[in-house]
From Swiss-Prot:
The keyword Nucleus applies. GO terms for biological process: regulation of transcription by RNA polymerase II. Its main location: nucleus. This is Mediator of RNA polymerase II transcription subunit 6. Residues 175-230, 253-325 are annotated as: Disordered. Residues 189-204, 213-227, 278-287 have a biased composition (Polar residues). Gene3D superfamilies: Mediator complex, subunit Med6 (3.10.450.580). Residues 316-325 have a biased composition (Basic residues). Belongs to the Mediator complex subunit 6 family. PANTHER family: MED-6-RELATED. Component of the Mediator complex, a coactivator involved in the regulated transcription of nearly all RNA polymerase II-dependent genes. Mediator functions as a bridge to convey information from gene-specific regulatory proteins to the basal RNA polymerase II transcription machinery. Mediator is recruited to promoters by direct interactions with regulatory proteins and serves as a scaffold for the assembly of a functional preinitiation complex with RNA polymerase II and the general transcription factors.
Amino acid sequence: MAGTQDPSSLEEILWRSPSHVQMMGGYLHSNNILFYFAESPFFDATSNNASLAIQANYNEAFRHFVETREAFEARLKTMQGLEFMVAYDPLQAAAGANAQFVHEPSNVWVIRKQTRRKRSGFEDEVVVLATFFVVGDCIYMAPSAASVIGNRILSAVTSLTSLLKTASTLPKFTPSHGHTYLPPAPKSTDVSHPSVQSQTSKENTPMPDADATNKSQSFTGSQNSSGPAVYDMRSLAESFSLVARYGDEFMDESPLMGEPGSFILSRPGDADRGAAPKQSQPSSTNAGGRVGTPLAKVDTPGKLSDKNSAAEEPKLRKKKSKPAS
């Protein structure tokens, strides 16, 4: 029988002993499973199982307690302290199963390490300390819930730590895109759309021969694709519609007036004001001048003096007529 060991180290070991299985009849069953478990390092020599087995070896009155597992466990239930009990017997489970449910019998034994405390007038208080599995001739210790959760949390924290270390070097900052994990991809230009204009540098300017080749290729490509033709027809129809709707309107605040060569900037209300007087004035036709051309008025010095003298004569006549009245 093995002594006590650290429970944390027992979770990481597997124990098996084919020689003990051969000594116990070649296979494990309900009456020898606890004695096979007593040879493993998971067994505690200070338990009630060990003390009862020692008493049976030296006292014939206790011999019948070790002959069957039912008698052995019944004796353990009358004692108080640390004990090992079979919690699941695959042979009994297979024998007590429903005959209509056909299944293969399991070969997994479940043994519990527990403490029993007697209470007068009440049922015994049993506290489970550990659980063990016997699969074939291999014995395992079931991990505790705390160790399982701790290992899962440790695994998650380790993965997150490595992720944060990797992700801390990925972000890049640009004024146009801000913080990004991937470099910004250049925007793809759609050549088929008429509003998209390709901007080429002087270094990429093709030679004359290459230019002619590119033009021929683009011409053949435009004939094969119906997309540009549809956009061209739509643009042409929209242009005709705009001309028919707004062809007579001007966006200039001060429209030009006059003829070519003598345009004059006018205020918006000048055209309306000058329309009525021009209609009332009779149209004068001069044989010497061209139609629509303004005539320049030139006065000679001799004619100017005659006009002035003719204007002064009526004034003198009016002055003379006043005394007579």
